Amino acid sequence: MLDPPMRNGSMSFGSQMQAFLRRFTDLPAALRALATALFMGLPLWATAQVSPLDGPVRFGILPLGGAFESRSDWDPLLTELSRAINRPVSVLSVNSYEALEQAIQRDEVDMAFLSGKMALDAVTQRRMKVVAQVVRHDGLPGYRALLLARKAPPLNSLKNLLEQPEHWRLARGERQSVSGFIVPQLQFFLPNHIAMETRFSSEIVGTHQTTALAVANSEADVATNNTADFERFRLRFPAEAERLQVLWQSELIPHAQIVVRREYPADLRKRVQAFLTGYGRAKGARGDAERVVLKSLHDLAGFVAADNSSLQPAARLAYQLARQNAMTAQWVNDAAREARLQRIESGYAEQVGVLKDVSP
């Protein structure tokens, strides 16, 4: 039964719909088809926004050499990973630690190869979980930070560096770099009352390859580096490496980790972990090919299963550096320094709590 007209002369909703349908059926067939497609497509478009967790797994890579170089080294492994987890894997390779850190903060990275402070921040602040840690052929549980200088005089001795740092030009890593900044600052420069950011005549900030080349080519006088990257540098730049010497080396630093977004299903994280820990372990041609890929990735021997607790040494390093900086900084009064130290203690306690989560 039709709805009666409203008393004010307007039509009821049912009458309006019938009028609309009569006009719609009078349209040419082509226009009716177009209108139907648009009408039906609107709700689909509104609900078909793809979640990042349903799209490609976005893998972030530390810029250890250069962006292109890092990507080409990882491509074969990531192609196999894509097959193993039955999902596409895209690569984010950047030119700086800062660029990778910003991408992680914008949730543009789902999985990453990170070390030290960056891995720690990803786990404690950006909802990531550790699934694996790299191992190298030397069998050591870590690597060492280095200070490199030219063999040729005059600026070629640790004694001279300690006595006159303002005469030296520094080439260092970014502040997020464990061996390029954090460990040299904590274990060498600050104990000798030298602030890396202010005591040198000039500085170059870049990758480990960039810093080593800067000293070899006389663009800087001392560079931060590490044992793993310097070995790689010797192979790629033998003539330049021959000009360099090691002035200092640190205590052992734990190897880098693979972290995965916490929102991914546990089953996917386990499959990623299983793939990584099995990569390069097989016998025969396939295993040989995988071991060649691993060797190109900073002479890696493979991966071992790991969890968030593997970042406890990194948390301890960051805590020690923050305390050192607070103790040596200038403050308006003792209360301000004490407040800063209390915030450092509180932040460290929170990190330790997060790192106790060792669930898969």
List each model region and its residues.
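Boundary at the C-terminal end of the N-terminal hydrophobic targeting segment
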Residues: 46-50
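A ligand-binding cleft/hinge motif common to bilobed small-molecule-binding domains
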Residues: 116-126, 189-190, 216-217, 221-242
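Short helices/loops that flank or line small-molecule/ion binding pockets
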Residues: 98-112, 125, 143, 208-223
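Periplasmic-binding protein-like
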Residues: 56-63, 136-146, 238-273, 291-307
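Bilobed "Venus flytrap"/periplasmic-binding protein-like clamshell domains
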Residues: 54, 58-82, 94, 140-213
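An extracytoplasmic/periplasmic, membrane-proximal ligand-sensing/linker region
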Residues: 65-66, 72, 76, 271-360
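Bacterial N-terminal signal peptides
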Residues: 32-43
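N-terminal secretory signal peptides that target proteins for export/translocation
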Residues: 1-29
